[in-house]
């Protein structure tokens, strides 16, 4: 589905203004273009962050306006698009624009959502719930496969570890890989401190380089990275997003590590 290239799902957490979204997408494209023969970039952003900590938090422009902006990004840059969906109705609408439909971690066991998304024949990215063991993801996988759609990505995004904290168990990467689909590591949500700032989530972005290196070394097929020109003023997940400047600095490291691990795996066959 993605050949041997490293999968890189990258973009801002939530769609802000059209101009801002296009600027971020354009900058990411500039940064990844030199790696085009080795990295498969997919732009991501959400039209609705339905699980914000506070009722007063910005959720996004909504389904219709959000899909219009994502369509503009797709047409302008010629990039594949991923967004998350929350209901069967949203899945059917989003599939008209997006190449990949993402099942949010909190919704990864919702049968009707999984089946409806899969029936669109889009690629389905299932994020592992913070409350699930990696082997429990076989259930969501089977629900997608029941429709005849076998275009699946599995994303590891950390596991709940007490209150307001997540940990990443790298053993989950080979376990998930054993299900036969590409495994992506979410390097930004994995450093979240859910609800850690009372009305919004905190984060420890200083650990993103360490965790992303570990995930690639463990055999992950790619990374999921939320990035913004200025995370401090971002409208969602400001505490856990990576700045575009740091994203640029980490790209060659990710590329080299992924290439090294894949070369070693090929030599071991």
UniProtKB/Swiss-Prot annotation:
Instruction: Quote the subcellular location field of this record.
Output: Cytoplasm
Name the pathway it acts in: Carbohydrate biosynthesis; 3-deoxy-D-manno-octulosonate biosynthesis; 3-deoxy-D-manno-octulosonate from D-ribulose 5-phosphate: step 2/3; Bacterial outer membrane biogenesis; lipopolysaccharide biosynthesis
* Catalyzed reactions: D-arabinose 5-phosphate + phosphoenolpyruvate + H2O = 3-deoxy-alpha-D-manno-2-octulosonate-8-phosphate + phosphate
**What's the main place this protein lives?**
cytoplasm
Gene Ontology process terms (BP): keto-3-deoxy-D-manno-octulosonic acid biosynthetic process
Domain of life, per UniProt, equals: Bacteria
Q: Which GO terms describe its molecular function?
A: 3-deoxy-8-phosphooctulonate synthase activity
Q: Kindly list the residue ranges recorded as spanning the membrane.
A: none
SUPFAM superfamilies (UniProt xref): Aldolase
Say which family it is in. Answer: Belongs to the KdsA family.
Q: What is this protein called?
A: 2-dehydro-3-deoxyphosphooctonate aldolase
Look up and give the organism this protein is from: Chlamydia caviae (strain ATCC VR-813 / DSM 19441 / 03DC25 / GPIC) (Chlamydophila caviae)
Q: What lineage does UniProt assign to this protein's organism?
A: Bacteria, Pseudomonadati, Chlamydiota, Chlamydiia, Chlamydiales
